[in-house]
Regions:
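Conserved metal-phosphate-binding beta-hairpin within the catalytic cores
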Residues: 227
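Segments that shape or occlude catalytic/ligand-binding pockets
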Residues: 105
Length: 245
């Protein structure tokens, strides 16, 4: 009976939304760590924000953020995202960026890992020992949408971990030679030839890649939606502050 009770307590701890377990005000903490809400910066007002981890529409299937619904970034990183929005608007005023994830507290990262421990998603979630780019406010998950908020077809959904969601096939490195538009274009066109995504989805995905690279943000090879700076993680940890809350 004792073991059964302990098991129930453990399961409840895993399934309970993080915000229900803490009194932390994530918004206040983000500001304390000098991060900025992108929609409050000039040029970022019309970027749409729908944080997937503030819903159950994610691979975890749980609301991990609860009260956190704004997209926070390090100020210089936010300016690059806004630059991408400006580039996109210049190409097509009927389109906008739609942000799915931004800065993520390390406590949420660790909670995510506990939720997926022992599942098929375990390898896709860092354990939060040192933190990834989201945990430093220098990564963005996003797509392109119409001004009405309808996402364009990218050939695979957010948090899809199949080959259809990839943008590059070889082991990813942060050097310029391996992360350029030609490499990504050839790979994405190859997904069409393999029958994994449609031609229209490839065009949409390449538009996102082109816009983001022009703003000096680069996609992570396994996730078409994830963009980051061209810096090794060691340098990120050296220069940035971990969102240790």
């Amino acid at each position: 009976m004792k073991h059964f009770t302990l098991l129930i307590i453990a399961l409840l701890a895993i399934s309970t939304p993080l915000a229900a377990q803490t009194s932390e005000d994530f918004d206040a903490k983000m500001r304390e760590y000098k991060l900025v809400d992108i929609q409050t910066i000039e040029g970022g007002e019309d970027i749409i924000v729908e944080l997937k981890y503030s819903t159950t529409d994610n691979f975890v299937g749980k609301d991990m953020y609860c009260e956190l619904e704004k997209a926070y970034f390090a100020p210089d990183f936010a300016r690059k995202v806004i630059r991408a929005q400006q580039i996109l608007r210049q190409r097509n005023p009927q389109l906008t960026l739609l942000i799915y994830d931004a800065a993520r507290p390390i406590s949420v990262q660790r909670h995510m890992r506990r939720v997926v421990e022992g599942t098929k998603f375990q390898d896709f979630v860092a354990d939060g020992t040192k933190g990834g780019r989201h945990n430093y406010g220098v990564a963005v998950d996003l797509t392109i949408a119409t001004n009405q908020g309808e996402p364009l077809d990218m050939g695979a959904g957010f948090d899809d971990f199949t080959d259809a969601a990839t943008v590059k096939g070889t082991s990813d490195t942060n050097d310029q030679a391996n992360r350029n538009l030609k490499v990504y274009t050839e790979y994405v066109n190859g997904l069409v030839k393999r029958g994994l995504i449609s031609r229209q989805a490839a065009n949409n995905r390449l538009l996102l890649i082109e816009v983001m690279i022009e703003a000096q943000l680069y996609p992570y090879r396994r996730e078409w939606w994830h963009y980051e700076e061209l810096l090794p993680m060691s340098e990120v940890r050296e220069k940035r502050r971990l969102l240790d809350f």
